[in-house]
Amino acid sequence: SRMDKYKSCHFSYFMRYGLQAEPRKPAGFTAPEYGTFVHYVLEHVLRDEMFRQTVLPGFADPVAGAEGRRRLRELTRAAVDRYVEEELGGLEHQTERFRYLFRRLLRSVQAVVDNVAEELAASQFRPISFELGFGSGQDLPPVELTVDGVTISVTGFVDRVDGWVHDGRLYLRVVDYKTGKKSFDLTEVWNGLGLQMLLYLFALEARGPDYYGQPVDGAGVLYLPARDAVVKGSRAMTDEAWRKQLDRELTRSGLVLDDPAVLSAMEHDALTEPHYLPLRVNRSGDISGSIASAAQLGRLGNYVDKLLRQISHEL
């Protein structure tokens, strides 16, 4: 995040991290607070054993999945209640407007949770790490490089890491929850922006075997929109129509490994009718979109390392 700030505007970087200047905090539930809220709910729901054992099995089935959806709502409500008590100290002392706005958010949060559950129910990839830290005293050491005789440490957190084991190798994808309109763009990467997820993926390829105890391959990176998506429609819009439009707002972006086995493991219908992955399939069955071969990912890793050294030298 700091690298993005530096590359986009040196002065903004100096104001924020040199002078520690911050904008005045408005009253209410701000976008960053909403992002923290969604992170909290998703992590607590996906970590829960009930989610793995009773929600996901048969979740995609319209009939058998009904019980799973009911349990998912219970898990979401429990996570929301915990957040309210732990982070907000309850709602009793909040203004009536704050409570009203917070209640409005609950529908969107449940829709995001439902969307993630539906994706995982149609996938063999499973969450294996949450808030995975790179840095001193964290899960993994920082990414370090020496430039001009000075060692630079890059630290941070991965929102979620999903894994799938195939032929004795662990395929990893990095998932980043985004509360804004951010999407993955290779043009930005070329200009030194949006390196965060790729940096984490390549670091996991290097350090993952020791951490996870088996050979590791990078399977890709995905931005998951976790914002309070605004759905435009009439008051007569049905819940089903509202959900379909919201699902479009929650479309993922990113870059995934161009390997049929990996793509099918990420999403069962990836090679025919992808719904969650940033792919397109034409009538001939040819796949296009945000895909890269293992060799292309390797070259991209070398380019990211070059950019890191350039940024470190400039700093």
Task: Name these PLM-found stretches.
Residues 1-315:
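Structural signature of nuclease core domains in nucleic-acid processing machines
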